[in-house]
């Protein structure tokens, strides 16, 4: 809320990336967001087969209140003097993206990819519900696992303020993508991942398949140690994206990997 007030005082729009939460878990516009973005490749598509994104303009932000957005306020020559902020309100930002950015970049999604995303939306609530249900059980399993130092998931936060925020904003659950820290270092983390069989070793997330990765040596390998720690990534950090498989199978796979690590 303090950040939101700061943003309001600065007269800049509040943009929220809601990819991991999805509209099923939280709707940022209802809490004051001006623009919401999604990587549709993740939960919306659901199967890691299609690349695309979504930008949602709430229509609540006044782009004419200062001189920070001349490209939206000033007359556009290519559209015969149209001012997107004045003539296309309240959907000024969305209209600008369609009329200018898509025209200039050619980033138009193909019909078949659009079809795949629309199909994904039909089962979004069912899939995310299962993702979250499985994730909560996996979190509890990892929390009680002696070879785990820490599990980073909002459902088990010991911070009272975080608990209250979690209950307020995530009544349907805190998502299925999280990290945990295994006892040891990078060597132990990589050995654990190498012994997973049901989990796929992929950098993607939010797939119906359960995914695991070692961020320090993959997605964030270009960062130095200080930069990694600044982002909450340690050598023993493992990221999981819990899928929709039978949760007993998921936990059994994790259990077998821990047994291999203990040998």
Write out the residue ranges for each language-model feature:
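Short, small-residue-biased leader/transition segments that mark boundaries at the very start
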Residues: 2-7
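Active-site beta-loop-alpha junctions enriched in small/polar residues
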Residues: 19-21, 156, 183, 243-245
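Residues that form or flank phosphate/diphosphate-binding pockets in enzymes
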Residues: 23, 187, 249
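Buried hydrophobic positions in well-ordered alpha/beta secondary-structure cores of metabolic enzymes
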Residues: 14-17, 28, 53, 131, ...
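PLP-dependent enzyme catalytic core of the Aspartate aminotransferase-like
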Residues: 1, 127, 194-195, 210-263
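Active-site C-terminal subdomain of aminotransferase-like
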Residues: 35-38, 44-177, 181-210
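Short, surface-exposed connector motifs at secondary-structure boundaries
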Residues: 8-12, 123
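Conserved PLP phosphate-binding loop immediately N-terminal to the Schiff-base lysine helix
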Residues: 1, 12-46
